[in-house]
């Protein structure tokens, strides 16, 4: 019978890498470790363990897992709760009431910011860090650059260089609070140097401090939920740029598989329909294409080979 060793929060053990190397050399057991990114990032494991490990990144709950944890059926209210409260497993121990859940999430958020970002990265301008995190949360799914943020801040009499903005954004990424999505040319898949998008790792952490206005935020939440779904399915996710300034919300690649996705709240008028379906129709290949929305009556249809899906159905693919 094989032997297993499980060690939680291994970064609290001084010199843990020496012990692990000795155990590896003895070949006496399979070792499973967890660590907080406050003091140990995955990029450092290769130094500590000389590459002799397999890393598993643990994400928050998917939508189906959220339903299962909370013993819910898929419904309009369940989807709203998912978009509002996010995917952290501990929420299973709390009533899904905004005041209670957001208080818990604010504590988690503060811990991440103070331990995983400020302490680890040696952040000196904490006020700016919090402002940048809030700005990123309010601009989920929007194209922006560090240079533009720096210029905006200077117009508000806040002197932060482009390099400082880049470093602070990277610190938020290193703490797994936000994720960067690169922009590519749809035709040639050339990666652009500027014009990235950022999405939160957890919707609840995005909402708890910024304040949630569902009517104002719904498009952002839909896009963030789609990104999380694709990431959990191990796709490499990009946003696409087409000729004439047209945009594809998501290009997702996994091995030889490619899918294109447009996201919107509802098909309110013909202009919206033309934008969402028209951009996908302009892509001349045979990879799957989706328009994802909250339309109840038209979701499930197929227009010129493009699948129109309700968000709840897409998140269960």
Language model: regions and residue ranges:
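Short, polar loop motifs at secondary-structure junctions
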Residues: 38-43, 292-299
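Active-site ExK catalytic segment of metal-dependent nucleases
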Residues: 257-268
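Domain-level recognition of nuclease-like catalytic cores that cleave nucleotide substrates
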Residues: 296-317
């Amino acid at each position: 019978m094989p032997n297993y060793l499980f060690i939680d929060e291994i970064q609290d053990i001084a010199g843990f890498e020496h012990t692990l190397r000795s155990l590896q050399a003895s070949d006496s057991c399979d070792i499973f470790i967890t660590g907080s990114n406050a003091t140990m990032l995955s990029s450092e494991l290769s130094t500590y363990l000389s590459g002799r490990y397999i890393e598993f990144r643990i994400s928050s709950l998917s939508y189906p897992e959220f339903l299962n944890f909370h013993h819910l059926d898929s419904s309009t209210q369940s989807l709203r709760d998912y978009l509002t409260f996010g995917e952290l497993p501990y929420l299973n121990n709390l009533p899904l009431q905004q005041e209670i859940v957001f208080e818990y999430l604010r504590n988690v958020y503060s811990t991440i910011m103070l331990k995983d970002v400020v302490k680890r990265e040696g952040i000196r301008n904490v006020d700016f860090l919090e402002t940048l995190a809030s700005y990123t949360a309010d601009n989920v799914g929007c194209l922006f650059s560090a240079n533009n943020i720096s210029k905006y801040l200077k117009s508000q009499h806040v002197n932060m260089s482009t390099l400082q903005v880049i470093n602070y954004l990277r610190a938020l990424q290193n703490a797994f609070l936000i994720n960067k999505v690169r922009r590519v040319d749809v035709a040639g898949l050339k990666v652009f140097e500027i014009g990235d998008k950022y999405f939160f790792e957890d919707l609840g952490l995005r909402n708890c401090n910024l304040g949630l206005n569902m009517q104002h935020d719904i498009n952002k939440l839909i896009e963030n939920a789609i990104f999380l779904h694709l990431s959990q399915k191990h796709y490499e996710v990009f946003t696409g740029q087409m000729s004439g300034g047209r945009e594809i919300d998501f290009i997702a690649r996994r091995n030889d598989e490619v899918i294109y996705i447009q996201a919107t709240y509802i098909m309110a008028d013909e202009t919206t329909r033309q934008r969402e379906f028209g951009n996908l129709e302009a892509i001349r290949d045979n990879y799957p294409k989706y328009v994802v929305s909250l339309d109840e009556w038209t979701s499930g249809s197929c227009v010129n080979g493009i699948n129109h899906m309700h968000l709840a159905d897409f998140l269960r693919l």
